[in-house]
């Protein structure tokens, strides 16, 4: 079966998309960029600002039309908008089969199975969970560079920002996990890593009791094949 994946929003969202793509590819699904031939459509949404929310809604409505009039059998919505407007999406857009919250994207295979079985539900997890699937990412950035998400969420609950409510509190990815992921990316031909997080310089404080970005950088520099690291 063929899957169309639409990824909206920031680089951190793109990393989640690549993780889901890797999981789907491991199951044997074929990726396509053609809405007309897609059996399953997945939209990884953003709603950080009003324009991003509008773009997400527009994409969902457009893909809902392809589901009604094309070959698509399932429409799945993931990401920040899915986390914020969980039930509303299912209630107001009946073409949507499954909604995955920001910390439940590692259940994408379950969501596909449920959608194809005709179920309509919201899949969520604890907002402070940290999904760490073992499947290798499917890099979509052209091969020579890739984003490495070193942390998730934010502890600063600013009145103008919704990130903690849709991404949870700040939590670092364990260093050994990041080094393994970076090694996997290097083996796929990646030469340049771009480290991303909501608060990059805070990396490691929650896990190791002190800011550990310098140590992480030193360890990443030891990986053969990685020539550049951007922060």
Predicted regions and their residues:
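Proteins enriched for Cys/Gly/acidic motifs involved in redox and nucleic-acid/cofactor modification
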Residues: 1-203
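Alpha-helix-loop-beta-strand connector modules within alpha/beta enzyme cores
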Residues: 210-228
């Amino acid at each position: 079966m063929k899957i169309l994946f639409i990824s909206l929003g920031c680089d951190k969202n793109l990393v989640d998309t690549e993780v889901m793509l890797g999981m789907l590819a491991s199951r044997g699904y074929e990726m396509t960029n053609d809405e007309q031939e897609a059996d399953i459509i997945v939209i990884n949404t953003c709603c950080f600002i009003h324009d991003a929310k509008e773009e997400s809604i527009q994409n969902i409505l457009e893909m809902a039309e392809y589901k009604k009039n094309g070959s698509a059998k399932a429409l799945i919505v993931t990401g920040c908008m899915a986390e914020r407007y969980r039930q509303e999406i299912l209630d107001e857009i009946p073409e949507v089969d499954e909604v995955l919250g920001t910390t439940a994207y590692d259940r994408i295979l379950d969501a596909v199975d449920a959608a194809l079985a005709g179920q309509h539900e919201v899949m969520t997890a604890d907002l402070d969970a940290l999904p760490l699937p073992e499947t290798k990412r499917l890099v979509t950035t052209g091969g020579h560079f890739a984003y490495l998400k070193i942390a998730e969420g934010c502890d600063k609950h600013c009145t103008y920002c919704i990130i903690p409510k849709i991404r949870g509190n700040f939590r670092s990815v364990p260093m050994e996990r990041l080094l393994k992921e970076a090694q996997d990316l290097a083996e796929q031909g990646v030469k340049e890593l771009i480290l991303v997080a909501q608060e990059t310089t805070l990396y490691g404080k929650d896990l190791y009791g002190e800011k550990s970005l310098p140590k992480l950088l030193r360890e990443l520099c030891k990986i053969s094949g990685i020539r550049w690291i951007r922060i």
